[in-house]
């Protein structure tokens, strides 16, 4: 893997995407200085904007509504800070949205994981235009008659870039069915500001295809899904440097860029093999007699300890865990204590093991933990297809405060599952990784519409617990996985929230109830993941002096983690 090429592309691509998005927004009167009104000659069906040329720039139809949505979001963000911050936020948000989708689709097309098996960004035969542009109607994409007519018109006019953007958005929205956490239905303004080209040799698509060796994405040729994590880390290089350079307090929004560091592969393997792998080896080494046929009661203590170590080494070699370290020889007293601990953590069924990375970043540790779990399942007699599904449903968990990193961790884990199970991307199975969300904007007025049909005792209990949960998750992105969450009745809370009924008439009070229900169900999933116990916790924790955080983080850590209040890494330990 050529990490220099990956780094150079990711840093350059971020700046290029932001510049292109800024240009698109500027055409419609939205700049760093402010938001311009449409020119007087505008009509409800066509708006004109002065861009300093003889002819004004015009937008029509759906684009008018998309621009209105963009302005609405900017004004909302402006209230929370100022216009300059809101404008920068939009540029960064749209840029990372399309960057994440570009690199994900590149990985999928190279490994032939796309449902249509037709390349979206490149061509199997090396043409300039992607195969999707050449044969759009050979895909499984569902086009309306109007879209079909528009595609034919654009092909006739050789408007390749416009045609590509139309098809690329269509493909992203279609992938929502199988990878909803990454390919969310695009916001109106996200589509409006998309400015990708397949013809321009100085464009992001061209550089992605030509600057990074295709084999770095190709699993069959030594590529790894971990390339997604490296791309994301390098994408954040300049924001990270800027946060450090300002010499001030690190804000909530800056914590991810400042603290994320992609963990090298050998360190990941070392940590997972000596935690999750140790569970397996502890179980196996105690299941039978040793190689010479004698039981422990027939050996001297030194012989028994030597045999334990030999057995561990042998099992690790069988599993090809070269970073596994056998336990050192112990005295009888220490061994008895260790055996008690091991007996407490010994699992009866591989499906019962719970593994979490509480600050998962882009998922490197989770991806390798998936491989080790797969080995354990195969040893227990499972086939790979069933094992992959069970790992997603029962074993693997992840959390992070960064929405962008979460999307890529989710993608990486799902691609790892796809490696073992061709049918896993059917939309029926997803992974239990989450971006921690805050409760700050939950409309608590809607709680009175929840619990329809449930008895009063359950409703009252659930409402109290939901209120407590919302209080706990206020400003949750400030604290992340170090939050202390009570172990609520999760099944009750899910029933309570799902039983929403505001009647037939939508009122000012009940407007937006469906959104609140979806948000609450997500918060319940996140809170349960934080609250529950795990057999294995593996992570590369964030490294940041607490004194560099803001007052809320300082106060929370001092109150809840007084013995490790100096640095975030110590808090996680």
Segments from the language model and where they lie:
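Non-catalytic, mostly N-terminal accessory regions of nucleic-acid modification and defense proteins
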Residues: 1-292, 296, 414-433, 438
């Amino acid at each position: 893997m050529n990490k220099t090429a990956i780094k150079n592309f990711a840093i350059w691509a971020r700046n290029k995407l932001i510049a292109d998005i800024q240009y698109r927004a500027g055409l419609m009167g939205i700049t760093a200085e402010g938001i311009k009104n449409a020119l007087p000659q505008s009509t409800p069906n066509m708006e004109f904007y002065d861009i300093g040329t003889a002819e004004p720039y015009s937008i029509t139809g759906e684009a008018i509504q998309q621009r209105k949505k963009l302005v609405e979001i900017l004004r909302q963000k402006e209230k929370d800070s100022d216009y300059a911050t809101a404008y920068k936020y939009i540029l960064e948000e749209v840029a990372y949205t399309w960057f994440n989708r570009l690199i994900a689709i590149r990985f999928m097309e190279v490994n032939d994981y796309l449902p249509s098996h037709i390349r979206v960004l490149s061509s199997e035969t090396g043409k300039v235009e992607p195969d999707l542009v050449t044969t759009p109607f050979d895909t499984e994409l569902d086009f309306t008659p109007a879209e079909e007519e528009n595609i034919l018109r654009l092909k006739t006019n050789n408007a390749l870039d416009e045609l590509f953007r139309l098809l690329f958005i269509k493909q992203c929205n279609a992938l929502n069915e199988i990878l909803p956490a990454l390919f969310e239905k695009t916001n109106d303004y996200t589509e409006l500001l998309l400015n990708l080209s397949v013809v321009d040799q100085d464009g992001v698509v061209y550089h992605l295809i030509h600057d990074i060796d295709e084999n770095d994405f190709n699993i069959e040729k030594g590529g790894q899904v971990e390339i997604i994590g490296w791309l994301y880390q390098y994408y954040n290089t300049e924001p990270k440097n800027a946060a450090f350079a300002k010499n001030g307090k690190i804000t909530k929004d800056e914590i991810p860029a400042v603290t994320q560091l992609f963990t090298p592969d050998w360190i990941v393997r070392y940590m997972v093999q000596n935690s999750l792998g140790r569970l397996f080896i502890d179980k196996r080494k105690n299941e039978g007699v040793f190689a010479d046929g004698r039981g422990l009661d027939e050996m001297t203590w030194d012989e028994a300890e030597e045999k334990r170590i030999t057995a561990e080494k042998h099992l690790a070699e069988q599993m090809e865990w070269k970073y596994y370290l056998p336990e050192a020889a112990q005295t009888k007293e220490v061994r008895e204590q260790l055996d008690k601990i091991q007996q407490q953590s010994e699992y009866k069924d591989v499906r019962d093991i719970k593994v979490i990375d509480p600050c998962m970043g882009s998922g490197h540790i989770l991806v390798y933990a998936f491989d080790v779990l797969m080995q354990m399942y195969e040893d227990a007699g499972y086939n790979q297809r069933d094992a992959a599904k069970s790992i997603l449903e029962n074993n693997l968990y992840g959390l992070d405060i960064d929405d962008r990193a979460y999307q890529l961790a989710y993608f990486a884990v799902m691609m790892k599952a796809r490696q073992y199970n061709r049918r896993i991307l059917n939309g029926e199975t997803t992974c239990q990784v989450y971006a921690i969300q805050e409760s700050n904007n939950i409309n608590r007025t809607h709680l009175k519409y929840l619990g329809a049909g449930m008895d009063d005792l359950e409703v009252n209990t659930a409402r109290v617990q939901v209120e407590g949960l919302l209080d706990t998750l206020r400003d949750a992105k400030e604290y992340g996985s170090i939050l202390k969450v009570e172990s609520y009745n999760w099944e009750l809370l899910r029933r309570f929230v799902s039983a929403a009924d505001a009647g037939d008439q939508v009122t000012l009070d009940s407007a937006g109830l469906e959104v609140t229900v979806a948000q609450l169900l997500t918060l319940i999933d996140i809170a349960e993941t934080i609250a529950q116990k795990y057999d294995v916790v593996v992570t590369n924790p964030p490294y940041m002096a607490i004194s560099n955080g803001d007052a809320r983080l300082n106060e929370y850590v001092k109150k809840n983690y007084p013995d490790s209040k100096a640095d975030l890494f110590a808090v996680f330990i």
